[in-house]
Swiss-Prot record:
Entry's localization field: Cell membrane
Presence of the UniProt keyword Plastid in the record: no
Source organism per UniProt: Heliobacterium modesticaldum (strain ATCC 51547 / Ice1)
Transmembrane segments: 26-46, 47-67, 69-89, 116-136, 151-171, 192-212, 246-266
Stated role: Transmembrane (T) component of an energy-coupling factor (ECF) ABC-transporter complex. Unlike classic ABC transporters this ECF transporter provides the energy necessary to transport a number of different substrates.
Topological type in the membrane: Multi-pass membrane protein
Subunit-level organization: Forms a stable energy-coupling factor (ECF) transporter complex composed of 2 membrane-embedded substrate-binding proteins (S component), 2 ATP-binding proteins (A component) and 2 transmembrane proteins (T component). May be able to interact with more than 1 S component at a time.
InterPro entries, sorted: ABC/ECF_trnsptr_transmembrane, ECF_transporter_component, EcfT
Name this polypeptide is given: Energy-coupling factor transporter transmembrane protein EcfT
Family to which this protein belongs: Belongs to the energy-coupling factor EcfT family.
Gene: ecfT
Sorted UniProt keywords: Cell membrane, Membrane, Transmembrane, Transmembrane helix, Transport
Length: 266
């Protein structure tokens, strides 16, 4: 299941979404994420998936690759759905012994589940279509006004990029540790859910040690290349927003404003 996580991975393709400026994609992802939690009805949240589907088609990424990335969320989504089904008061739809499933619980559970799916898909699309270097440069340029008040903008952008880049690295490291422990008799696939969770506890120490080792190696590599933060740093390929970038930014911002103004009517 861990190998199915696509968050933090980058797939180099030539698509309209890949060619967009990273600032455009960051702004679109941020506004979409906020709007997703402003939408008040199940119908509006369901329709919010339409731009995600259009974006997936435009990226030219295999559909099964996107669906595979959502697979690790299913346990959390099912748990969230059950919590809303069993704890939300309202008109009873089905009664299962002492538990009553309400229509309101069905609506709330479906809304929250869809929000999680669309949010994960939007964030994954950002990292799948944007290289770590471009994402770092885009975040730094977006946050550059913060330099005037002394905020460490470059360092924040660099940390965010490294954190996203390390997600697939740590997943790969976890799989290696699990295979090594399985060869020594460890069992991660059988037993109840609680037993499976407990079996993952012995992974934490070697995984943390591996993460610290990789962080130390990265720090040494950056120092060997005379990295001293963003002061005086130039870019080989400066980011320049095209007409398409401005059009997408204006369109996304316009839809976001309309949602904020008329969310009660949706």
């Amino acid at each position: 299941m861990l190998k199915d996580i696509t968050l933090g991975q980058y797939v180099p393709l030539d698509s309209p979404v890949h060619r967009l400026d990273p600032r455009t994609k960051v702004i679109a992802t941020l506004l979409f994420s906020i709007a997703l939690f402003l939408l008040p009805t199940l119908r509006s949240v369901t329709l919010a998936g339409l731009p995600i589907i259009i974006a997936i088609v435009a990226t030219r990424l295999p559909i099964h690759y996107i669906l595979r990335g959502i697979k690790p969320l299913w346990i959390f989504i099912v748990f969230t759905l059950l919590v809303h089904l069993l704890s939300t008061p309202g008109e009873t739809a089905v009664r299962l012994g002492p538990f009553a499933i309400t229509w309101e619980g069905l609506r709330q559970g479906a809304m929250v589940s869809q929000r999680l799916i669309w949010l994960y898909a939007a964030t994954s699309l950002l990292t799948l279509t944007t290289s770590p270097i471009a994402l770092t440069d885009g975040l730094e340029l977006l946050l550059s006004p913060g330099k005037r008040i002394g905020l460490p903008v470059h360092e924040f952008a660099m940390m965010t990029s490294i954190a996203l880049r390390f997600i697939p690295t740590l997943i790969e490291e976890t799989e290696k540790i699990m295979k090594a422990q399985s060869s020594r008799g460890a069992d991660f696939d059988s037993g109840s859910l609680v037993a499976r969770v407990k079996s993952l506890v012995p992974l934490m120490v070697p995984l943390l040690l591996s993460a610290f080792r990789r962080a130390d190696e990265l720090a040494m590599a950056m120092e060997a290349r005379c990295y001293r933060g963003g002061e005086g740093r130039t870019r080989m390929r400066p980011l320049v927003m095209s007409g398409k970038d401005y059009a997408v930014t204006v369109a996304v911002s316009g839809v976001f404003i309309l949602i904020c103004l008329w969310k009660k009517a949706l």
